[in-house]
Structure formats: C-alpha cells, structure tokens
Amino acid sequence: MNILIFAPHRDDEILGVGGTMLKRKKQGDHITVCLVTAREGEVLPECTQRIHDEMRRVHKYIGVDQYIGFPFGANRLENVSRIDFNRAFEDAVKQAKPDEVYLPFWGDMQKDHQLTVDGAMVALRAKNIYSPKRIYAYETLSETGINTPCVNNMFV
C-alpha cells in the first residue's frame, strides 16, 4: 500500500504520525513524506543544516521510501500563488499514487497547517485522475483545536 504524508514543517510528520509510519513500514507499505515548507534557511538559518540532517536520519530510521520537498518557506505560504501551490500538491499526489493520505487537522490554528490541508484537498478531490482510498487527519500537538470555527446561530 502507498502512504503519502503531507507535513507542513519538519517534524510534523513525526509528531503526528511517527508511530503509524513505523507500524505501516513493518507491514511492508511504501511511505512518502512530502514537506510543504522545505525551503532552507528562512527560520533558524544557523540551525538549518542540522535540522535537515536530523530529519533525514529519522526518515532513514523509520524507513521512509521517498521524500518530496516543496520550494516554499515556513510562515510564508499565504504569499504563494494558489496556482503554484495547488500544482505542487497535485504533482506530489501523481508521483506518490497514494492509497492513503495523512494531513494535519484542518482545525489547527497554525496557518501553514491550514493551508497544507487546503492544498492537499484540492489535489485529492474526486475530479482528479488519482484519488486515494482513505484520507486521515493527524494532530501535531501544537495549536490543534484552538481554531474551532465560530458557528453563528443568529444574524442581526
């Protein structure tokens, strides 16, 4: 089975579905991790190489088969053209051909997490050529659930 995990930032995939990744790898599944904010050096530039190396070591330990990095910077996704953004997600889905997809929870307050869900859902909608069997949301223990939408029941 092909598994595709969209991670807004480095370590979101480990914090959110690290245990699931280990379990699925032991079952023989093919795991692709797609890092949405892979552009280097914008946040903590002095630590960039160390953080990247740590991510690669963890991916190797878990058995990640494929890594896809988007050319977008952390906390700058709102400035990316929606066409370019959505196309990157569509290309990742075409490349990974996932049976299952894991996304951050849509109610997370962190804007990069919200936009990751938006981009992925555009790429995964039924009209596209390739659709997975299942889509799951994962928690990253940051601001999940804080951004609960207001549902109004009265209008003035």
Where would I find each of the regions flagged by the language model?
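Metal-dependent de-N-acetylase/amidase catalytic core
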Residues: 1-6, 23, 27, 43-54, ...
